[in-house]
Regions:
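A structural preference for short, hydrophobic beta-strand core positions in alpha/beta folds
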Residues: 47-48, 85
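A generic structural signal for short beta-strands and their flanking turns/coil linkers
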Residues: 8, 41, 53-55, 79-81
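Short S/T/G/P-rich N-terminal loop/turn motif that feeds into the first structured element of a domain
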Residues: 1-40, 44-46, 93-101
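Short, well-ordered beta-strand segments in beta-rich or mixed alpha/beta enzyme
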Residues: 11-15, 49-73
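An amphipathic, aromatic/His-enriched active-site/gating alpha helix that lines ligand/cofactor pockets
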Residues: 63-92
């Protein structure tokens, strides 16, 4: 459980809603506003990747709470993306969690 001033990392899988995006240039242009709006909501988009496979994008996000991550997901939804968010733990931290098992 993060302490009060710590951020938790989230991985968000995002898919384009084709009816909302008309061309690839429009899609590339949404990331600036998404980053700005997420920052204003208290989250930081640390990385984003275009993905080959089942999903269109992977977004890594730091947020102080689940509620802030939820707000960031809704911001992305407003920009034409369907988003699935998951809390992630670095493998080193995971190793420490399970070392006594």
């Amino acid at each position: 459980m993060p302490q009060q001033n710590e951020f938790t990392e989230y991985a968000l899988l995002a898919d384009i809603r084709t009816a909302d995006v008309q061309n690839p240039q429009e899609l590339a242009a949404i990331w600036g506003p998404i980053r700005k709006e997420c920052t204003e909501a208290g989250a930081e988009v640390t990385d984003s990747y275009a993905v080959l496979g089942e999903h269109d994008f992977l977004v890594l996000l730091d947020a102080p709470s689940r509620d802030v991550c939820f707000k960031a997901s809704l911001i992305m939804e407003r920009h034409g993306l369907d988003v699935q968010s998951m809390e992630v733990v670095p493998t080193e931290a995971f190793g420490k969690l399970v070392e006594d098992l």
